[in-house]
């Protein structure tokens, strides 16, 4: 690992690892090594969900479970995590195999999002739950301040469907146009055709569902609803 880039990353994260091997593992995609980050990602995903749920519970004492679930989903979804990864310049620190490097894996949203979760898992193992909770809340401060309950927290497919139904327009159609990668690490490309749009919008994700959500979000942006 390039020590200059790693030090820069740790400054942006706001955390310096005591055990550098945890940081290295968190940054390692399965295409690069058998000692990859998927177990850390599993751990980090659960920790992130808990921290954000706890924060929302205390910030919104009068909001019901449904709205809190939708707000949490917005905050922990893949494109939000990928945005954070780009803010950290995480792509330049990833350890990828030759195939992933060639295909631009350092830019792929699913890899960036998974690595953020792996970093959370790594920080927890390197420190404790109090430290990682404070760090996550620091990362999310602006997003937590800006989020609010309401229809905007519904997932993009639901919002797009409700928008079209409200105008008596046909429902959108979703078509898988490409599946890349091996079974354990696939990337789906979806075309979403919306009535009134000359061309389909495109969504990419690590599952068909995530790719459809990404395509629906692009449709909402084109409709001026995002």
UniProtKB/Swiss-Prot annotation:
A GO BP entry: regulation of gene expression
Gene Ontology cellular component annotations, sorted alphabetically: cytoplasm
Catalytic activity: Endonucleolytic cleavage to 5'-phosphomonoester
Pfam family membership, one: dsrm
EC number: 3.1.26.3
Places the protein is found: Cytoplasm
Keywords: Cytoplasm, Endonuclease, Hydrolase, Magnesium, Metal-binding, mRNA processing, Nuclease, RNA-binding, rRNA processing, rRNA-binding, tRNA processing
Cofactor list: Mg(2+)
SMART domains the UniProt entry points to: DSRM (SM00358), RIBOc (SM00535)
Chief location of this protein within or outside the cell: cytoplasm
Record keyword Oxidoreductase present: no
Residue ranges constituting the RNase III domain according to the UniProt record: 6-128
Residues that bind Mg(2+): 41, 114, 117
EC class (word): hydrolase
GO molecular function: double-stranded RNA binding; metal ion binding; ribonuclease III activity; rRNA binding
Annotated DRBM domain residues: 155-225
Entry annotation: catalytic residues: 45, 117
Function text: Digests double-stranded RNA. Involved in the processing of primary rRNA transcript to yield the immediate precursors to the large and small rRNAs (23S and 16S). Processes some mRNAs, and tRNAs when they are encoded in the rRNA operon. Processes pre-crRNA and tracrRNA of type II CRISPR loci if present in the organism.
Record-stated family: Belongs to the ribonuclease III family.
NCBIfam families the record matches: RNaseIII (TIGR02191)
Assembly: Homodimer.
Name of the protein this chain belongs to: Ribonuclease 3
